[in-house]
Amino acid sequence: MEEKAPLLLTIAVLGGTGKEGKGLAFRWARAGYKVVIGSRIPEKAVTAASEIIELLEGSSSVVGASNLEAAEQAEIVVLTVPYAAHRDTLEGVKDALKGKLLIDVTVPLVPPKVSKVQMPPAGSAAQEAKAILGEDVQVVAAFQNISHEHLMTDSDVECDVLVTGSSKEARTEAIKLVEAAGLTGWDAGPIENSVVVEGLTSVLI
């Protein structure tokens, strides 16, 4: 079992009612972090939070809120929405992210079979996030290649997470969260390298 993190640090998981977001929220709540699940529909976020608390037998601090409210309450924000909602979600929480760390899990997969990626003009979803948010937000890309099925278990998982980001400091902070989730994090360099990691997702699927 991981060392418990102080409950002073709050992580918001935007789009946290989806499988990937819920799995990450479960992992961090299990490790002792305070977690706020965000959603376009706050009621769904509240339900997801209740389900996680039940899985952890009530021994966690998890609440549900709108995406904006979740972003406002957290020091670290994790974005787990489908690519179709990527830009709109970021625009909606942009002001709340200033001075914070954003971990972008989004991959620009082409629906419905999601067997290929279509990179945006910015280069990758993470680079697009950086372009939208500007210099006031540290942006990191991570967790794109981890199955939600591995996350919703009560044990460590032998999975590697490649972490790319806008600064060494931001990548180091993100790797701490990777390890808190029971995974192994690797510094994969600057955010421009996120195009490689995002592109790998469709191959693994």
Kindly label every feature range from the protein language model.
Residues 2-54:
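NAD(P)+-binding Rossmann beta1-loop-alpha1 motif at the extreme N-terminus of oxidoreductases
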Residues 7-10, 99, 158:
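Phosphate-coordination loops involved in phosphoryl transfer and adenosine-cofactor binding
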Residues 50, 91, 127, 131:
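Active-site phosphate/pyrophosphate- and oxyanion-stabilizing loops and adjacent acidic/basic residues
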Residues 56-61, 66-101, 105-113:
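Rossmann-like NAD(P)-binding element
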Residues 82-85, 145-146, 167-168:
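Short beta->alpha connector loops
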Residues 106-153:
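Rossmann-fold NAD(P)-binding glycine/threonine-rich loop
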Residues 132-142, 156-194, 198-203:
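Internal alpha-helical scaffold of NAD(P)-dependent oxidoreductase catalytic cores
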